[in-house]
C-alpha cells in the first residue's frame, strides 16, 4: 500500500517551474521561482501584462502551493507600446462592447500603462469581466480594479444560501469551510486543499445575492502530502 510523503520546497519549486514551462504563453527563461514553506514568489519579467497573469495562474494550479507573491515586472517591447491615450480609448471600447458590463458603469484611467478601473456594478462577475476585458490589451503594464459592488437586491439569508452553494459545489469540500456573515459582508475561514479551491470558494461567496464584501481567510493545508 502506498504511503504519503511531505513535498519539500525544492520539489514544489520544480513542480511550479514545470507548470510554467508547460504554459505556452509564458517565457520561462525570464521568470524566477522562490519557495519557502509552500509560499511561492515569482520574479523576473514578462513582455506583456497577460503573460504576467498567465504565469501567476499557472503557479496557482500546482498542488501544494499555499500562497503566491507576484514580483514579476512587465517590460514592454517597442512593438506593443502604446500611449496612455490609446490604451484608455481601447480599454473603454472593450468595456463598452461587453454584454456583461452595464454601459457607462466603469471609468478607465491610464498612467504609464497602469490601467485603473473605477465605478459601481451590481455583481462581482461584472467587476471581474471589466478587468478581463482590458488585461490583454497591448501597452497595458498593470490593472488596478477599484470597481465597487453595490447590490440592488436586498440581502436574504446569505449564510444559508452560501452554505448550500458550497455544499453542492463538486470542486469544494464544504465541511472544511466556515461561513460568517454580517449584513452584506461574508467572512470565509477554514482550510482548503489547494489555491484553486481557495479562489473557487471566494467566487461562490461573491455570487450570493446581496453580497458586497468578501474577506477570504481560507488557508491552504500545509504540509501538503504526495502519494509515494
Predicted ranges, named:
Residues 1-228:
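N-terminal targeting leaders
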Amino acid at each position: 500500500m502506498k504511503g504519503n510523503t511531505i513535498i519539500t520546497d525544492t520539489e514544489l519549486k520544480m513542480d511550479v517551474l514545470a507548470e510554467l514551462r508547460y504554459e505556452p504563453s509564458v517565457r520561462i527563461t525570464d521568470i524566477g521561482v522562490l519557495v519557502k514553506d509552500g509560499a511561492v514568489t515569482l520574479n523576473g519579467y514578462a513582455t506583456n501584462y497577460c503573460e504576467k497573469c498567465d504565469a501567476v495562474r499557472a503557479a496557482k494550479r500546482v498542488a501544494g502551493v499555499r500562497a503566491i507573491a507576484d514580483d514579476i515586472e512587465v517590460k514592454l517591447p517597442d512593438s506593443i507600446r502604446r500611449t496612455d491615450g490609446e490604451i484608455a480609448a481601447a480599454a473603454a471600447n472593450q468595456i463598452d462592447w461587453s454584454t456583461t458590463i452595464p454601459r457607462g458603469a466603469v471609468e478607465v484611467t491610464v498612467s504609464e500603462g497602469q490601467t485603473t478601473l473605477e465605478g459601481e456594478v451590481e455583481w462581482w462577475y461584472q467587476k471581474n469581466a471589466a478587468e478581463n476585458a482590458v488585461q490583454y490589451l497591448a501597452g497595458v503594464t498593470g490593472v488596478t480594479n477599484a470597481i465597487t459592488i453595490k447590490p440592488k437586491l436586498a440581502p436574504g439569508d446569505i449564510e444559508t444560501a452560501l452554505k448550500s452553494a458550497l455544499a453542492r459545489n463538486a470542486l469544494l469540500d464544504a465541511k472544511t469551510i466556515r461561513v460568517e456573515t454580517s449584513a452584506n459582508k461574508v467572512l470565509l475561514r477554514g482550510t482548503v486543499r489547494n489555491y484553486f479551491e481557495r479562489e473557487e470558494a471566494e467566487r461562490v461567496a461573491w455570487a450570493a445575492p446581496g453580497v458586497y464584501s468578501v474577506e477570504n481567510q481560507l488557508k491552504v493545508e500545509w504540509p501538503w502530502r504526495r502519494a509515494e
